[in-house]
Regions:
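Pre-Walker A (pre-P-loop) alpha-helix and adjacent loop at the N terminus of AAA/AAA+ ATPase modules
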Residues: 9-56, 244
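P-loop (Walker A) phosphate-binding loop of NTP-binding proteins
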Residues: 53, 87, 155
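Walker A/P-loop
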Residues: 3, 42-79
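Walker B catalytic acidic pair
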Residues: 52, 115-116, 127
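Conserved alpha-helical scaffold flanking the Walker A/P-loop in AAA+ ATPase domains
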Residues: 37-40, 93-113, 142
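Conserved beta-strand position immediately N-terminal to the Walker
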Residues: 48, 112, 150
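C-terminal engagement/docking regions of AAA+ P-loop ATPases
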Residues: 1-7, 11, 18, 246-326
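Canonical AAA+ ATPase core
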Residues: 94-99, 120, 132-229, 269-274
Length: 326
C-alpha cells in the first residue's frame, strides 16, 4: 500500500510533536493526553486552564514545556492580595534621569504559569485576562506588546476548595481548553517514586537531560502549517452542529458560544497535523470536544444535584450528532 507523500510542513508538525513528547518523557511520567492537549493549544495560539488537586505535576509540566519550546518562563502565585501591577508591571520614577521607567511584570514572558488563578480577586484576574485576549498590556495609558508566543497555563483547584473566586463565564471563555489533570495510574505513580528514589528532582530539569526540541521561530512556522490543514464542509457542519446542540440542552443555563466552535475547528487542525494528516477527520473533533467545551457549559443547579457534569453533556451531545461519512 503506497501512502501518499505528506507535505513537508505537515511532517514537520508531526516530527516536532514527537520530539517534544520524547523530551518531556524524561521528566514527566504518563499524562500523555494532558501534554498533547497543551501542544494543541500552543499550535493554535490558545491559552489553557489546568484543573486538578495540588501535587500532580502541573508546575513541572509547565516548566518542562517552556524549556522544550525555547520559551521564557515565569510563574505567578495568585493570592488574595495580588494587585494588577504585580502582574503587568509599573512605571517607576528614576531620580537620576527625572523620567519614568517601565519595570516590567512577569507577564512579559513566553510561557506564563498562572498558579491558582481562582485565589485572586476579579480585578487582578481581569488584568491577566485582558493580556490574554489582546496579547498586549496597557500601563498608564501606554500599550506594550507581549511575546509573539505568549501563552498562559493557568491552574485552578477544583471549586470545592475554600477561599476561591470562581472565574466568571466571560473570562473562562478566553481559555481555548480546560484540561482536567487526573491522579496518576498506579503503575505511573510507582514509576514516579522509582525516579525520585534514584535521585530525580523536579527543580533540576537540566540534570534530567531535558533539551530544547524546537526554537521560537520554528513554533511560529508550525502554527502557519497548522492553519493550512484542510477542513471539508461536512466536518465544518459537524462542528457547528455539536456546539449548537449544547445550546438546546435542558441541563444547561448556558451552552457554548461561537468562540467554542472556532476553537474546536482550529484545535482539530492541530490534532490532524500532529498525526501527520493534511485534513481533519471527525475523530479529531471528538478528541477535543470535552477540553474545548467543558468550561463553557454552565449547568442548571438542579442538573448538578442530579450529578450531571459538563463532560457527561459533551458525551451525550457527541452521541446525538450524526458523524459525517468519510
Amino acid at each position: 500500500l503506497d501512502l501518499p507523500e505528506i507535505k513537508p510542513e505537515i511532517a514537520a508538525v508531526r516530527d516536532a510533536a514527537n520530539r517534544i513528547r520524547q523530551e518531556l518523557a524524561k521528566v514527566i511520567v504518563g499524562q500523555k493526553d494532558v501534554i498533547d492537549q497543551i501542544l494543541v493549544a500552543l499550535l493554535c495560539e490558545g491559552h489553557v486552564l489546568l484543573e486538578g488537586v495540588p501535587g500532580i505535576a502541573k508546575t513541572l509540566i509547565a516548566r518542562a514545556i517552556a524549556l522544550v519550546i525555547s520559551a521564557d518562563f515565569a510563574r505567578i502565585q495568585f493570592t488574595p492580595d495580588l494587585m494588577p501591577s504585580d502582574i503587568v508591571g509599573t512605571n517607576v520614577f528614576d531620580l537620576s534621569t527625572g523620567k519614568f521607567n517601565l519595570r516590567k511584570g512577569p507577564i512579559f514572558t513566553g510561557l506564563l504559569l498562572a498558579d491558582e488563578i481562582n485565589r485572586t480577586p476579579p480585578k487582578t484576574q481581569a488584568a491577566l485576562l485582558e493580556a490574554m485576549q489582546e496579547r498586549c498590556v496597557t500601563i498608564d495609558g501606554e500599550s506594550h506588546a507581549l511575546d509573539p508566543i505568549f501563552t498562559v497555563l493557568a491552574t485552578q483547584n477544583p471549586i470545592e476548595y475554600e477561599g476561591t473566586y470562581p472565574l466568571p463565564e466571560a473570562q473562562l471563555d478566553r481559555f481555548m481548553l480546560k484540561i482536567v489533570v487526573p491522579y496518576p495510574a498506579y503503575e505511573t505513580e510507582v514509576e514516579v517514586l522509582s525516579r525520585y528514589n534514584s535521585g530525580f528532582r523536579s527543580v533540576r530539569l537540566d540534570e534530567a537531560g531535558v533539551r530544547s526540541a524546537i526554537s521560537k521561530d520554528e513554533l511560529l512556522e508550525l502554527r502557519r502549517a497548522v492553519s493550512g490543514v484542510l477542513v471539508e464542509q461536512p466536518v465544518i457542519e459537524y462542528i457547528a452542529k455539536i456546539v449548537r446542540r449544547t445550546r438546546e440542552n435542558r441541563s444547561l443555563i448556558l451552552g457554548a458560544s461561537p468562540r467554542a466552535s472556532i476553537w474546536l475547528l482550529l484545535g482539530s487542525k492541530a490534532v490532524a497535523a500532529m498525526n501527520g494528516r493534511e485534513f481533519v477527520i471527525p475523530d479529531d473533533v471528538k478528541l477535543l470536544a470535552a477540553p474545548v467545551l467543558r468550561h463553557r457549559l454552565i449547568l442548571r443547579p438542579e442538573a448538578e444535584i442530579e450529578g450531571i457534569t459538563p463532560d457527561r453533556v459533551v458525551e451525550s451531545t457527541l452521541a446525538e450528532v450524526e458523524v459525517p461519512r468519510q
